[in-house]
Amino acid sequence: MGRGRVEMKRIENKINRQVTFSKRRNGLLKKAYELSVLCDAEVALIIFSSRGKLYEFGSVGIESTIERYNRCYNCSLSNNKPEETTQSWCQEVTKLKSKYESLVRTNRNLLGEDLGEMGVKELQALERQLEAALTATRQRKTQVMMEEMEDLRKKERQLGDINKQLKIKFETEGHAFKTFQDLWANSAASVAGDPNNSEFPVEPSHPNVLDCNTEPFLQIGFQQHYYVQGEGSSVSKSNVAGETNFVQGWVL
């Protein structure tokens, strides 16, 4: 009679479980050895019992087989990484391209273009979107206008304050100037009423020449000498006082 089919579940009996582990472990190690010898394969087998005990088999050594495994695994990852990166970039480009086309189409629809292919629901959605954008634009415009008006009010108040300060300064300086002008007029009037005022001596601008004790200016005339030559004779020069138009006297 053959053995019955073994149910694949955990053996609850501890002794039976330990016996089964020992039998199957030995069989597995034997099969690994046979595989390495018959097929010239590099085989490594590592087993841990439920108690944590280690059982191992390596046709060329466990460490050598593990190093070879790591090299093959890392090489496989490095070879697959560029392909995965390229595939990821391609997917990203496809997504961005689709998004760009959608944005371009939406922009054209907002400008009132390419509306022929849109249905009623799409047109209603576009209308609501335009109304919302228009409302937001109006609110922003109102806000900007209010801010500008507030700035103008501030500038108006500042200019009003400056104007008040200038007015006060002008009135103060004008009063001082008027006081100085009155003092000047009073001083001039007092000088005109009393010319002998020692504080403001005034000299005549046009003095009388006859009052000056100066001698008259003396201008002396000059004599003219004529040389008269008669016929056939020579006449010596003569001094003719009456005929020389000699001017004597005091000339004022």
UniProtKB/Swiss-Prot annotation:
Q: Would the keyword Coiled coil turn up in this protein's UniProt record?
A: yes
What biological-process terms (Gene Ontology) are attached?
cell differentiation; floral organ development; positive regulation of flower development; positive regulation of transcription by RNA polymerase II; vegetative to reproductive phase transition of meristem
Which segments constitute the K-box domain?
A: 86-176
Superkingdom classification of source: Eukaryota
Protein name from the UniProt record: Agamous-like MADS-box protein AGL6
Keywords from UniProt, A to Z, are:
Coiled coil, Developmental protein, Differentiation, DNA-binding, Flowering, Nucleus, Transcription, Transcription regulation
Matching SUPFAM superfamilies: SRF-like
Asked whether the keyword Transcription regulation is assigned, the reply is yes
Q: In which tissues is it expressed?
A: Preferentially expressed in flowers.
Q: In which compartments does the protein localize?
A: Nucleus
Q: Read off the Gene3D superfamilies from this record.
A: Transcription factor, MADS-box
Q: Which Pfam families match?
A: K-box (PF01486), SRF-TF (PF00319)
Query: Where in this chain does the record put each MADS-box domain?
Result: 3-57
Q: Which organism is it from?
A: Arabidopsis thaliana (Mouse-ear cress)
Gene name per UniProt: AGL6
Coiled-coil blocks: 91-173
Role summary: Probable transcription factor. Forms a heterodimer via the K-box domain with AG, that could be involved in genes regulation during floral meristem development.
GO CC annotations?
nucleus
